[in-house]
Amino acid sequence: MAINYDVRPVERNDVRDFVEQHHYSHSINGLRISYCFGLYDGDTLVGAMLYGGLAMANAWKKYGDKETDVLELRRLVLIDDTPRNSESYFIGHTLRWLKRNTTVKVIVSYADPNYGHSGVIYRASNFEHVGMTSPGRVIMFDGKKYHDKAVRTKYKGELKPFAKRVKQALDDGTAHYVKQKPKHIYVYRLRK
């Protein structure tokens, strides 16, 4: 089956609900997002992709000379009923758009084996596997997983209300840490 989708730059709010419904994380809260793309079948949104600054402070230094040289592919999600190779089609179109319309040099993405991902789609899109992250941990709270930095988020020097609730839950035993496997790191060079 031939892929006949349109790839369009969109605003964050155009894809927020779609990502929250279809991506395994069910969230884009807290993401630094620079570019958003929608994958459309006619007027129907069937996929979303979000690029932004790397989640880890100063991690960009491994890949570029300055922070603006590097973006992370933060979210990629398509509905299940798309033809084979739709993900690589979508990635390829967004990479070409970024190369034509930005000065970004490097795209970094992570494949999370904790969700059964090994990076097949990145290898199919000519990303280079450059290693693994360190093992991490998440916080299980109210039946959901949260990044362990959720207990450190501050606003004007004070812990945010949600961070206080999670910290209290850890203290009283209603939340707990769970170890995570290291993630695969993939890199795509847009330009030298």
Regions found by a protein language model. Give the residues of each.
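A short, compositionally biased
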Residues: 31-34, 133-134
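Short hydrophobic/aromatic beta-strand or adjacent loop that forms the aromatic wall/cage
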Residues: 34, 181-186
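Conserved beta-hairpin
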Residues: 19, 33-53
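Acyl-donor binding region in acyl/amide transferases
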Residues: 6-9, 52-172
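Short amphipathic alpha-helix that is part of the acyltransferase structural core
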Residues: 1-31
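Short beta-strand-to-coil "C-cap" segments at the C-terminal boundary of structured domains/repeats
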Residues: 187-192
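Short, P/G- and charge-enriched loop/turn segments at secondary-structure junctions
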Residues: 25-26, 169-176
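A short, polar/charged loop/turn motif at coil->beta-strand junctions and beta-hairpin connectors
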Residues: 1, 13, 45, 65-67, ...
